[in-house]
Design a protein with these regions (language model features):
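Short glycine-rich or small-residue beta-strand-to-loop segments that form or flank ligand, phosphate
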Residues: 83-90, 112-115, 131
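Active-site cofactor/cluster-binding pocket
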Residues: 64-100, 104
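N-terminal glycine-rich anion-binding loop in soluble enzyme alpha/beta folds
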Residues: 4-68
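Catalytic cores of large soluble enzymes that bind and process phosphate-bearing ligands
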Residues: 40, 61-65, 88, 124, ...
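Conserved short-loop catalytic and cofactor-binding motifs
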Residues: 36, 57, 88, 116-120, ...
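Mixed-charge interfacial surface used for oligomerization/domain docking
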Residues: 4, 10-24, 28-31, 96-106, ...
Length: 183
């Protein structure tokens, strides 16, 4: 059974890696200084971080809509895929996974939606995705790849070590006193 792999734009792949691994991406939207961009489509990571560094406020993101995922899943079904493994940013960080689950219930293709909860986002999810793509290319079934993805995601750790606490202060995650004490 051939299956597709779908991620959101928090997965830490370049455009070249998406293409080489045959991974399909549904972008989140980012809002910076009043402008909205489709993440990794209309703005690169480098452009995002540059604009964030020069912004007075903190950028915001919004999840893809269920319709965005429904379009992706229907397109994959039309292309002949019989199933999909979709791995997304942790549900505690974003509503992206709920949009994906809602869409999965509306389409005529077997979609397995996985929460990158322990992985959080980015590189940890990318490592799991790369492994299941390798399995897919070697003939693994959807069930086998799903089991491996769950195993890898359960082992993942997500740590953050920011160079500066400025954005945590701007976003209200830390108080001025906490930032001062951490310095």
């Amino acid at each position: 059974m051939s299956f597709a792999v779908v991620v959101d734009s928090t997965c830490d792949f370049t455009q070249e890696e998406y293409k080489a691994l045959d991974v399909h991406m549904v972008p989140l939207s980012v809002l910076i200084d009043g402008e909205t961009f489709k993440d990794q489509v209309e703005i690169t990571s480098e452009q995002f971080y540059e604009r964030m560094a020069n912004s007075e406020g903190l950028p915001q993101s919004s999840q893809p809509t269920p319709y965005d995922f429904e379009q992706m899943y229907n397109t994959l079904a039309e292309q002949g895929y019989e199933g999909v493994i979709a791995i997304h940013i942790a549900g505690v960080l974003s509503g992206t996974i709920e949009s994906s689950r809602t869409a999965a219930e509306q389409v005529d293709i077997d979609v397995r939606v996985l929460d990158g909860a322990r992985a959080g986002a980015t590189a940890s999810i990318a490592l799991a995705v790369a492994e299941i793509c390798k399995m897919r290319d070697e003939g693994a079934t959807l069930d086998e790849a799903e089991a491996k993805a769950k195993e890898l995601l359960a082992k993942a750790e997500f740590l953050v070590a920011p160079e500066t606490l400025e954005n945590l202060l701007k976003g209200g995650r830390l108080s001025a006193d906490q930032v001062k004490n951490a310095s």
